[in-house]
Amino acid sequence: MRVSNVTVRKRLLFVLLFGVIVFLIIDTRLGYVQFVMGEKLTSLAKDSWSRNLPFEPERGEILDRNGVKLATNKSAPTVFVVPRQVQNPMKTSKQLAAVLNMSEEKVYKHVTKKASIEKITPEGRKISNEKAKEIKALDLKGVYVAEDSIRHYPFGSFLSHVLGFAGIDNQGLLGLEAYYDDDLKGEKGSVKFYTDAKGKKMPDEADDYTPPKDGLDMKLTVDSKVQTIMERELDNAEAKYHPDGMIAVAMNPKNGEILGMSSRPDFDPADYQSVDPSVYNRNLPVWSTYEPGSTFKIITLAAALEEQKVNLKRDQFYDKGHAEVDGARLRCWKRGGHGLQTYLEVVQNSCNPGFVELGERLGKEKLFKYIKDFGFGQKTGIDLQGEGTGILFPLERVGPVEQATTAFGQGVSVTPIQQVAAVSAAVNGGTLYTPYIAKEWIDPVTKKTVKKQSPIAKKQVISEETSKQIRYALESVVAEGTGRNAFVEGYRVGGKTGTAQKVKDGKYLENNHIVSFIGFAPADDPSLVVYVAVDNPKGTIQFGGTVAAPIVGNIMRDSLPELGVKPRKNQIEKKYQWNDTKTIEVPNVVGMSVSDLESLLVNLNVDASGKGSKIVKQSPAAGTKVKEGSKIRVYLTEEDEKEAAD
C-alpha cells in the first residue's frame, strides 16, 4: 500500500517538531545547568576532589587598662592526615607514634580511616613546637602540621574568676572568655589543595588560601597594680585567718569601672580541672548572696538624710542596749548599750537600735523605695556570668520587725557587687552606675579601637548635699568609730564595718560570721571604693572592724598612690584607743649629724647607710606620718664630702 506524499510530509514534520522540542529541552537544561547551577556544581565538584586543611585564628588577647597582658596565646600546632595520600601506612604509623607517644595501632587506625581528612586526637592536638618540627622533618606523605594555639594565662590564678578560661578548641567556657566569646574567638581560615581520583595531591593545581581572621583584643577596666595589691592582701589574710572564703572588689565610684576583683578559694585557669567545679563556677563577688550586716546601714542613713528625717549633729538617741519592736527584742552589739548619742555617734558606733529608730521614721514604703532605688533586689548588669539578685521582703509581708531588721542589714540578702554599686552611689554625689569590666575592643592588626564601652548612669538616687553628709559621717566612722583600723594617714578614708551571722537551714549559726568592711577615699572626692568580706575567720574576734577593716586600709594605702591620687589635708584626726599604735610626723634630719638623732628620734628606729657622720638623705621624707616605732633610713657621708657637694 502506497503512502501518500501528504502523509509522508506530515510524518516528517512531526519528527522534525519532536526533534526541535527535544533539542530545546536539552538546550534549556544545559543552559540552566551552566548558567544557573554552574557555580554550585563547580563548588560541589571542587569539594569532591579538594581537601581543606583548617587554620585556626588567634584568640583575642585580654589586657588590663594599662596594656598588661592577662590572657594571651601560645603556639600549639595540630597534626592532620589525608589517608589516601599516605603511601606507607605501617611506616607512617610507626614514625608518628614515636613522636606523639601513642601506640602504633591507634595511629594506624587514623591513617587508614576512610575519611577525606583526619585529625589525630588527642595526642596530635595542641602539640609542642618541638614535636611539630620533628614531624615536619620526617616529611611523611599525607601528614600535615597546621598552626594552632592554646590559651595562656601568664599570671596563673591572678584575676582567675573574672577572666574565666577557654577550652581546647579555644572556645570561651567561663568568665569574660565566655561572656565576650563572639568578639574574642575570630573566624577560621584554611588551605584548600586539590587531589586526583586516588586522593593524590595534584602538583599542577595552586592551593587556595583563606586566611583566618583573628579575634579582637579586649582591654579591661581592671588595673593590674590594684589587683596585685588586693591579691597580696587576700593571701596574707588567708594565711592568718584560714577563712571559709574571701571576697574583694575595687571600683571607681565616678563611673562604675571595676579596678579589681578577687575571691578565695581561687584557681589557675590553665589547670581548672584540678579543682572542684564549685570553685571556678562561682565568682563570689557577683554570685554569692548573704545578709550584709551593718554595711547596709549606709542605705538606711542615705534614705533618712535625703528625706530629712534626721540631723546627724542635733538629733540624739539613747541606746539602752536593745529595741523593743512588736514584742521582739532587737539587741545592740554592745552589751548594755551606748547610752546617749548624737546620730553621728550612732553611725560611728554602728548602733542597731539607733538604726531601728531611723527605719521607723522612714516607714516601710520609703525605706524599701530607697533600697530598690540603690539597686538591691535586682541585677546590677555587670558584664560577668552568674550574677545573683539577692532577696528582699515583699512589701506586703514587711511588718514592724522586718522593717526594723532590714534597717540595720539583717533579714535581707544582697550580693557584694550590689553593695559596691550602691555605696558608690551614696558617696559619689548620688548617681547609681552600672558596674562594668570590659572597656574597649582593639583590632589586633591595626591596633585601632573598634568599639568602646561608656559608663552607664542609671539614676540619681540622692542629692549631692545628702552624699556630702554621708561622706562626712563615714569618714568619722574610720577616724573615730568602729572603722579605725582602715585609717590611712593623708587619704581621708571613709567606710563602714559589717558583721553578719551566717544562716543555715533557717537558723543563725553561732560564732560563724561573714565580717566585712566597705571603704572609699578620698572623702572629699572619692576615686576608689573597696569592699572586703571574710567568711568565718578563725582564731580571732569575728568583727568587721577587727578583720576586714585593716585589709581595706592596706589596699587603700598602696592603691591610691598607684592611681595618682594625691594626699589630702583637713583629715579628721584619728581617735586613738589604749591599744592603738600612734602615728608621729617624721622630722627633717638632713644636714644633721648622727649624734643629733638620739634625742630627736626617740619614737623611731634608725637604719643608717654609708660612711661618715653627716646625714645627706632620709626616707621617708620629712612631714610623713608613720606609726610609732617605724624605721627611718638615713644616708651618711663624711662632713668634708658634704661641704664639697654644697
From Swiss-Prot:
Top-level taxon: Bacteria
Keyword Zinc set for record: no
Family matches, as InterPro entries: Bact_Transpept/Beta-Lactamase (IPR050515), Beta-lactam/transpept-like (IPR012338), PASTA_dom (IPR005543), PBP_dimer (IPR005311), PBP_dimer_sf (IPR036138), PCN-bd_Tpept (IPR001460), SpoVD_pbp (IPR011927)
Membrane topology: Peripheral membrane protein
GO CC, alphabetical: plasma membrane
Recorded catalytic activity of this chain's protein: Preferential cleavage: (Ac)2-L-Lys-D-Ala-|-D-Ala. Also transpeptidation of peptidyl-alanyl moieties that are N-acyl substituents of D-alanine
Catalytic residues as annotated in Swiss-Prot or TrEMBL: S294 (acyl-ester intermediate)
Gene null: resulting phenotype: Asporogeneous; spore development starts but does not develop the spore cortex.
Biological-process GO terms, alphabetical: cell wall organization; peptidoglycan biosynthetic process; proteolysis; regulation of cell shape; sporulation resulting in formation of a cellular spore
Keywords: Carboxypeptidase, Cell membrane, Cell shape, Cell wall biogenesis/degradation, Hydrolase, Membrane, Peptidoglycan synthesis, Protease, Sporulation
Annotated compartments: Cell membrane
EC class: hydrolase
Pathway info: Cell wall biogenesis; peptidoglycan biosynthesis
EC number from the UniProt entry: 3.4.16.4
Keyword Protease among record annotations: yes
Stored Pfam families: PASTA, PBP_dimer, Transpeptidase
GO MF term list: penicillin binding; serine-type D-Ala-D-Ala carboxypeptidase activity
Domain PASTA: 580-638
Stretches assigned to coiled coil: none
Record function comment: Penicillin-binding protein with an unknown catalytic activity. May have a specialized role in the morphogenesis of spore cortex, which is a modified form of peptidoglycan. Spore cortex formation is determined primarily by the mother cell.
Family (UniProt): Belongs to the transpeptidase family.
Entry protein name: Stage V sporulation protein D
Species of the source: Bacillus subtilis (strain 168)
Name of encoding gene: spoVD
